[in-house]
Curated annotation (Swiss-Prot):
Name of a matching Pfam family: Shikimate_DH
Annotated binding of NADP(+), by residue: 187-192
Species this protein is from: Aeromonas hydrophila subsp. hydrophila (strain ATCC 7966 / DSM 30187 / BCRC 13018 / CCUG 14551 / JCM 1027 / KCTC 2358 / NCIMB 9240 / NCTC 8049)
UniProt miscellaneous comment: During catalysis, the active site Cys acts as a nucleophile attacking the alpha-carbonyl group of tRNA-bound glutamate with the formation of a thioester intermediate between enzyme and glutamate, and the concomitant release of tRNA(Glu). The thioester intermediate is finally reduced by direct hydride transfer from NADPH, to form the product GSA.
Protein name: Glutamyl-tRNA reductase
InterPro entries given in the database record: 4pyrrol_synth_GluRdtase (IPR000343), 4pyrrol_synth_GluRdtase_dimer (IPR015896), 4pyrrol_synth_GluRdtase_N (IPR015895), GluRdtase_CS (IPR018214), GluRdtase_dimer_dom_sf (IPR036453), GluRdtase_N_sf (IPR036343), NAD(P)-bd_dom_sf (IPR036291), Shikm_DH/Glu-tRNA_Rdtase (IPR006151)
Superkingdom in the source lineage: Bacteria
Amino acid sequence: MSLLALGINHNTASVALRERVAFGPDCIDRALRELVAQPGVSEAVIVSTCNRTELYCSLAQGQGEQVLQWLQRFHGLDAAEVVSAIYQHQDEEAVRHLMRVACGLDSLVLGEPQILGQIKQSYAHAQQSEAVKGSLERLFQKSFSVAKRVRTDTEIGASAVSVAFAAVSLGRRIFSDLSQTKVLLVGAGETIELVARHLREQNVTQMMVANRTLQRAQLLAEEFGAQVMTLEEIPDYLHEADIVISSTASPLPIIGKGMVERALKARRFKPMFLVDIAVPRDIEAEVDELSDAYLYTVDDLQGIIEQNLETRKRAAAEAELIVQEERDDFMGWYRSQHSVDLIRDYRHQSQQVADEELQRALLALQQGENAEQALKALAHRLTNKLIHAPTQALRHAAAQGDHHQLAQLRQMLGLSQES
């Protein structure tokens, strides 16, 4: 048996191709059942996210091409469409690849933690479809523990490397407990949505969403339990906000110095933290002149991100060493499983020989043969049959002049070294 990792990701395939190769919730169970029904495939897990689709299989040697052909058939793809984007890893490299993916070392954003949850969900699907057991089950459990160790023993996830995460991280520098703050989000696009998710992870429950169109803001508000307002209503509510994070496509500033100054007076000059992620700016630069307003722009965040990315790169180097160590540990276990099968088969074969010769000896005794002669014959035949295969191997190695194999056979048979 062999382990296989086969797939495409953001480094090898366009978004258009990744969309065509993806496995959605509506087809994942059927796909798993079909995959494990392929000749030689005993286990399978399918990991499918926006940035990658990967098939992990335990299968007979040389069956990787069959898995690739199944993938093409399932999605109705021509070989020419995927051949340049597909990568395949076997055994040690397949193990290393999965562990790196689980740790976020192969992600578009180095060290991002979301991929681990996605892999766990994929593994759960495989369990529900009874598509995973044995070696592949052990590999995924091992990969989860490796990812946890990397998170614990390195700083791979300690620093913000996205604009949204950096904005929230800056807020924590000013307000140690974000759960006690009220946040105004200006805009309702993808970046603001990601900011809202990070805020929720920090237990922020008081959010306001201001947007040019209320429909999009309401969708965001429903998900995060936020209050909704138009951009024109911001002056009426700005004083309630401890934190303001803005990201719109407005060509002109939405929040001016005078508006913030009035809000600070209403707050009795309690500090206000503002992050302007937009280009061009949503918040007038002069706001930074106010003593109780702390304004950061996307340029400030970029500097933090670049500094943090260097920290993550150093942590990633440490993580790679952990992955290598854990891969070797898993492969030691995996190879030992092959010896378990071999030992079982060898014992079964030897037991069959012993049973046959025992029955032959008992029959001889029943027919009146002398007991001593019957036992001597039993010992002679049993010895000859049990040493036949090793003897043939020794003769073949000697005939080939293979001294290395002869030494290995001598050690295996427990023979003392030649004088």
